[in-house]
Amino acid sequence: MSTPAFSLRNPENHARCAKPLRKRKLSPPQIDTPRSFSPSRQKRAKTTKILGQSLPVHRIIETLDRNALQSLLQQVAAANPQVAQSIVDLAPKPDTKDALAVMRAKFDAITAHLPYKCSAESDYSYTRVKPYLCEFLSTLSDFILNMLPPLEVDLQPACTILDAITEMIHKLPNFSNSEFQYTRAMAYDQLSTSWQILLDAADERLLVRVEAEMGLSRRLQKHNELSGGKLTQAVESAGRGQSPLLGGLITVDYSSFRH
């Protein structure tokens, strides 16, 4: 039996035919990198997602000035009647000083917008200040209604405010415009009615006290003169504070009295 030409047992043939093996070099991509350092295998830390949000209402209010806050409240109240009623229910009652400050500011806006180069009583002057005059009269109406019975039970603050309102009507520029003359006459009529309602509803003892502290009858007599007699009925209503209870406050001279 012949031996195969390429028998592994023939070292001479094996040495002649076999090619020497070369040691393979590992290329860089084939080099194993520890998994802990592999960028593709690293786990990114989870971060909490934070979204922007609007300021709370109380923070928004803190940033607003007086005018901006007033404008905002008026817009909200106009759009939401229930909110408007909540404001009425929750807002503190304005005191006499604050109420008068608002009305005087409205009055000052009229005089501040009078033109310089023409008569303050001209039609042009009236047309220019008419929007401010209407706002002033509207403001007076709101405050007058707020201090009449049964809302107002304290007579003296109400009389103080109504006295100041009457004084401001006297001081309005006497525009020659017929529309203004009619408006002013109506204002005096409404003031007279308001005085009567306020004084007729007052207890006589309270009226006596206000008369003693304010000299109400004297003030109304002066207002009546300046209005051209349009407050006569108000003067008569105030007269209840002089008789009969006021008689106890009058000093009587008994020096000539004979027993």
From Swiss-Prot:
Pfam families registered for this protein in UniProt: Cut8 (PF08559)
GO cellular component labels: cytoplasm; nuclear membrane
Name of the protein described by the UniProt record: Tethering factor for nuclear proteasome STS1
Protein species of origin: Clavispora lusitaniae (strain ATCC 42720)
Quaternary data: Binds the proteasome.
Family membership noted in the UniProt record: Belongs to the cut8/STS1 family.
Known role: Involved in ubiquitin-mediated protein degradation. Regulatory factor in the ubiquitin/proteasome pathway that controls the turnover of proteasome substrates. Targets proteasomes to the nucleus and facilitates the degradation of nuclear proteins.
UniProtKB keywords: Cytoplasm, Nucleus, Protein transport, Transport
